[in-house]
Amino acid sequence: MNITHRPVLLAEAVTALISGPLIQEKNAAKKIVVIDGTFGRGGHTQALLKSLEMSARVISFDKDLDAISVAQQIQDPRFTIVHDSFAHMDQYAQAESVDGILLDLGISSPQVDEAHRGFSFRREGPLDMRMNTDQGLTAAEWLEQAPQEEITRVIKTYGEERFAFQIAKAIVAKREEGLSPKTTTELASLVASVVRTREAGQDPATRTFQALRIFINRELEDLELGLKAALKLLKPGARLAVISFHSLEDRIVKQFFQAHAKVEIPRGLPVREKDLPQSALEIIGRVKPSDLEISENPRARSAIMRVAEKRMGAPV
């Protein structure tokens, strides 16, 4: 199995978590618990294990069975791998018991590079796209039965594709001929026949493949649930770092951070500043990859990491 994967913003993500006040606090009796929401190929997890004390514990999650098999090779008693989405991490830890959480929302290089996974329009393979190959419909199965209006909605909403209607119409037309796309290259060719204008440096199929991957794996729904679960699990003073790779993800993270970093007071209500309820989060900042990292790993170019810290006295 190809396990080569270069994690994005590796040093920055680890620093963002371990520089939080809880982990920096020197207390021999305290057992640090950190969650890596997407194990991938273990880059962030391994870096966290190297940076934390021997008494610490790192819990990683992943839906991908290939990632789980890689994780099971790690021989470190401080490490636990969970075959589940980070959306459900609050089922595996108690409220306010975690000292730091990292969510890396990017698809891993092996997932893209291994043709049989069906994520890449550049490699011939079955049109699968499922992170967890034990669950749900493949992209091909869904395209074979979804109404044209639903295909249009998915491609437009999750791919921000302006030719969504034309692409969906072409897919359904092929389906009616008994030629519904079954492979990655069949779908990519079909999209290319419809999308006549291409953005600089971008394949015509890029947005459609992104849309189907996000939809098939419920990525945005998982992100929304995961952010809520993270806020519940973090101790006051603990940090949450989220690395996103496209505007849909980043918008959700940004809006979540902003919504929980301010306190809504009814207009006209006389409240003194010292009596204001405490907001849940303090926004620490955002980080983008350096030019050097992008030159060494072009897949990092669209990444952005946002970091927030749970306030002392914040509501659970």
From Swiss-Prot:
Which GO CC terms are listed, alphabetically?
cytoplasm
One example of the protein's molecular function in GO is: rRNA (cytosine-N4-)-methyltransferase activity
Among the Pfam families in the record, one is: Methyltransf_5
Known EC number: 2.1.1.199
Q: Tell me the keywords, alphabetical order.
A: Cytoplasm, Methyltransferase, rRNA processing, S-adenosyl-L-methionine, Transferase
Q: Which GO terms describe its biological process?
A: rRNA base methylation
Q: Where does S-adenosyl-L-methionine bind?
A: 42-44, 62, 86, 104, 111
Catalytic reaction annotation: cytidine(1402) in 16S rRNA + S-adenosyl-L-methionine = N(4)-methylcytidine(1402) in 16S rRNA + S-adenosyl-L-homocysteine + H(+)
Q: What is its main location?
A: cytoplasm
Subcellular localization: Cytoplasm
Q: Which InterPro entries match?
A: RsmH (IPR002903), SAM-dep_MeTrfase_MraW_recog (IPR023397), SAM-dependent_MTases_sf (IPR029063)
Organism domain of life: Bacteria
What is the annotated role of this protein in its UniProt record? Specifically methylates the N4 position of cytidine in position 1402 (C1402) of 16S rRNA.
Entry's family note: Belongs to the methyltransferase superfamily. RsmH family.
Report the protein name in the record.
Answer: Ribosomal RNA small subunit methyltransferase H
- This chain's source organism reads Polynucleobacter asymbioticus (strain DSM 18221 / CIP 109841 / QLW-P1DMWA-1)
Which gene does this sequence derive from? rsmH
